[in-house]
């Protein structure tokens, strides 16, 4: 476990360093985008590294679930890239439904009364968070037989989820009428009043936060003799 914790820390540091170089180095930025497309296309090289990263991350998530007695397992919890194989089919579904329009080379879904479309495929062939979210809904509805799907994400993503839910309905990807709900909340801010960002560091980790909550609750209960 000590090794896994170190590897997770290494991944976080790697992510921050990569983001810094991505912002300042055009060649690195282009190669990074190419690597994403390769990963989404199933390239062996990128996929091998992804599997190592995702296994490390998910093992820590599972530890938190067990600590909180949440009954989730690997069939319920899937990393973003686990939907890669399903992304082309998602695009094809919307294409066959005549819901896609090309805009500056990208494939988009436009909604009546809205200026901003939902972009589902970039001009270079890469997919986006929206594409993955659409694939995830289809998986949860069809494979997990979910009746209600809740998204606990801060309110800045409200438009994104409204568009996702609308696109799902337009394409008929929710045949059992599962309830799709965005449980919006306020933005988590650091001591400077700015949103936390993984890429910039300084995050409060969930595991020590839970441990502190348990410790404080235990102290409080001991004081009132419960």
Can you name each region flagged by the protein language model?
Residues 1-225:
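NTP-dependent nucleotidyl-transfer catalytic core
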